[in-house]
């Protein structure tokens, strides 16, 4: 798969799934796209709280990179995938396992 095809597929998938351009760039100059999910949860002895899942995605030299941030805590590593479609399938699964919907 060529870098041009990967970029084209990436842009289509990003548009279809509601990610927005944050205006930020990685140190290598790649544009970062982001989407955030929120839900209200009941916490024992605390009451109602907001549960947040934020996913940032960008493409670096033809490789989709995904960064997961849950309740303000950054996951231990940046995930990389072999294609934009695989990255989006993984994001959908992460969102589903978090109890949220795309």
Where do the language-model regions lie?
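Amphipathic alpha-helical segments
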Residues: 2-23
């Amino acid at each position: 798969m060529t870098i041009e095809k990967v970029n084209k597929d990436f842009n289509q998938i990003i548009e279809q799934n509601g990610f927005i351009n944050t205006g930020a760039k990685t140190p290598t100059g790649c544009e970062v796209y982001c989407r955030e999910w929120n839900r209200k949860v009941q916490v024992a002895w605390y009451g109602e709280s907001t549960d947040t899942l934020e996913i940032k995605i960008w493409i670096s030299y033809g490789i989709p990179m995904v960064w997961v941030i849950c309740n303000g805590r950054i996951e231990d590593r940046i995930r990389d995938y072999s294609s934009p479609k695989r990255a989006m399938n993984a994001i959908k699964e992460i969102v589903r396992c978090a109890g949220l919907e795309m």
